[in-house]
Amino acid sequence: MSHSNLLLGAHTSAAGGVYRALLEGKKIGATTIQFFTSNQKQWKGRQFTTNDIELWQSTLKETNLTHLMSHDSYLINLGCPNQENLLKSRQAFQEEVIRCTQLGINYLNFHPGASLGEDVQKCLDSIVESLLLVRPFIQGNLRLLLEATAGQGTSVGHKFEQLAYIINGVKDELPIGVCIDTCHIFVAGYDIRTSSAWDFTLKGFDRIIGLPYLYAFHINDSSKDLGSRVDRHQPLGEGKIGWESFEFLMKDSRTRHLPKYLETPGGVDLWEKEIQKLKEFA
């Protein structure tokens, strides 16, 4: 796999129009991007005009980016025990699926949900039910990706077993997979600091979930310790995970080809340098 074929990018800004996320991706030397299709802190989502979609399509052709990923709203909790907020979450998620379909996006990355102190098993069952409700709206190449979480607060999805439970509940009905956030799984208790640690963790993932369900990575270092369950991203090589971990991801045959999206604090100037450094490892 040549450097030009490596799928590397970052979470770029769609402020002023979704097409701008593509332009920012090109600016940092990315071959792929993640972005918000709508304001991530509002229930009411953006509705695309014909002009929005045409501008997106023409910019996409110019930039030649592939394996595009949307990140859903932070407000959405598909396992919410509060019925009113669960219904709002399901509606917002459905709208997100529709926007992704309109843009021809490949992946919709989402945080599974949070139990808010209620029964965790009920939360997981509610997430499965919520996902099955969007089945009629999924078209084209869109695949839903569960993001492995940090386990902060009452969020679920920080254990591979929880992700496997959700996948097993929907895999026969809709396209599903996992996006591993390196910071998240590290603070959730999975050691990835060395090649041997990564190998052990990937073998565990394969045993519990199955490597064919691993579709993407969020690439972040962590300012917090292994197992701390506190989600704080750091620039690559400046946190508790370290460069060996990211070098492994760029070299190992199980992970090298998968899309990787930076969410490190520092913005476009840092991302350009980090993408270059990751390419050098490959």
Curated annotation (Swiss-Prot):
- Note the SMART domains from the entry: AP2Ec (SM00518)
**In the Enzyme Commission scheme, what number(s) does this protein have?**
3.1.21.2
Cofactor(s), by name: Zn(2+)
Which annotated residues bind Zn(2+) 3?
184, 231, 233
Signal peptide annotation: none
Instruction: Work out whether the entry's keyword set contains Metal-binding.
Output: yes
Q: Which UniProt keywords apply?
A: DNA damage, DNA repair, Endonuclease, Hydrolase, Metal-binding, Nuclease, Zinc
| Residues annotated to bind Zn(2+) 1 | 71, 111, 147
Give yes or no: UniProt keyword Zinc.
yes
- UniProt cofactor note: Binds 3 Zn(2+) ions.
One BP term from GO: base-excision repair
Q: Which reactions does this protein catalyse?
A: Endonucleolytic cleavage to 5'-phosphooligonucleotide end-products
Alphabetically, the GO molecular function entries are:
deoxyribonuclease IV (phage-T4-induced) activity; DNA binding; DNA-(apurinic or apyrimidinic site) endonuclease activity; phosphoric diester hydrolase activity; zinc ion binding
Give the main EC class. hydrolase
Residues binding Zn(2+) 2 are: 147, 181, 218, 263
Q: Name one Pfam family in it.
A: AP_endonuc_2
Please state which protein family the record places this protein in: Belongs to the AP endonuclease 2 family.
State its role: Endonuclease IV plays a role in DNA repair. It cleaves phosphodiester bonds at apurinic or apyrimidinic (AP) sites, generating a 3'-hydroxyl group and a 5'-terminal sugar phosphate.
Q: What is this protein called?
A: Probable endonuclease 4
Species the sequence originates in: Protochlamydia amoebophila (strain UWE25)
